[in-house]
Amino acid sequence: MSQPVLLLGAGRRCEYDEFVLTRIAAARPVVLVDAAPPDWARPHLDGHLAADPGKDGATASAVVRFAARHRVRGVLTCSGEYTVAAARIAGQLGLPGTSLATAAVCADPAALRALLTGGTVPVDDPGPPRVCAETVVLDGEIRIAALTRTTLGPAPARQPLRHTVHAHDGLLHNRFLRLAVDRTVHALGVTRGVLHIGLRLTDRGPRVTDVTPRLPGDLIPLLVRRATGVDLAQAAAALATGELPDTTPTRQRAAAIQFAYPAATGRLEHLDLSPDAAREPGADRMILTQHTGNQVTAGPHATTADRLALWAAVGDTPAACDDTLRRMARHLSATVVPFATAA
């Protein structure tokens, strides 16, 4: 096997996770570290190490034994639950990657806030309006590859309703946002990696709310690639293996994704997607993410697991993407029978 990268966990949802796996696998052989690889992941793998990434100690031992027989080039994960484990294993193998200390502090909101405050980083609680800096760091050079603007749903859950990436987003030139991102990276001591830095736009300027020290979810890497040409997944793989990432923009467009949540809490009785959605100009994809018969929770209290569908669009501007998303939404129909009336 030719110098693979180890991926801790394939992810739980093909609809969200397969894109990133395909991009990593296009650049380097991938060995999945997971108890059992999902069927959708198998075509993209060069190998499988049977170990539960959630069992940190046992997984580390299994990886060390594997690395004694194969030259492992890097360790990656796209799963929040395995970020600390991936950092620990990379450190044990002497490979590039997020430090254990950084991974641990990003997983603890109180510790992260204290660290950032001590590093003169302006912080705030999560909330609208929200923007995330898709940041690539290499040896002191901090590059914001793209900005993701997120429309949040109703409280208290405030789940994302839509993400939008625009190659010409005016905030890319906002010096206060760039300063907040730079200070965040320095406070965390990150010298190499891909970060998803969440910020809240306030009257006092951008305020950092959270930091994800790995690739973002929700198909944001897809949006970034469609809008700018920058491949965040391959950049993350390059950084994890000690190589130079290519973050040169090759596109000047916009891309957006929208999620449908149940209108009521109850049993999903009907869910249908017309194939005409794929024929809408600007449509990238539209996928059902729920099954009839399942119990679902309405938007204000929903989780990502309650989403009914996702659909993505590409256009010259965010407004063009919005128009396409609206047209695509007409091809989705759903009926939820509230629990109070369900038979």
Predicted segments with their positions:
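Glycine-/Pro-rich loop/turn segments that contact NAD(P) or position catalytic residues
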Residues: 104-121
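Peripheral (often C-terminal) accessory segments that flank ATP-dependent C-N-forming ligase machineries
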Residues: 6, 30, 237-343
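Short amphipathic alpha-helical segments and helix-helix/interface helices
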Residues: 17-22, 113, 275-276
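Short, flexible turn/loop "capping" segments at secondary-structure junctions
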Residues: 42-43, 157-158, 301-306
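ATP-binding N-terminal substructure of ATP-dependent carboxylate-amine bond-forming enzymes
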Residues: 1-102, 106, 316-320, 324-331, ...
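Internal nucleotide-binding/catalytic subdomain
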Residues: 123-206, 213
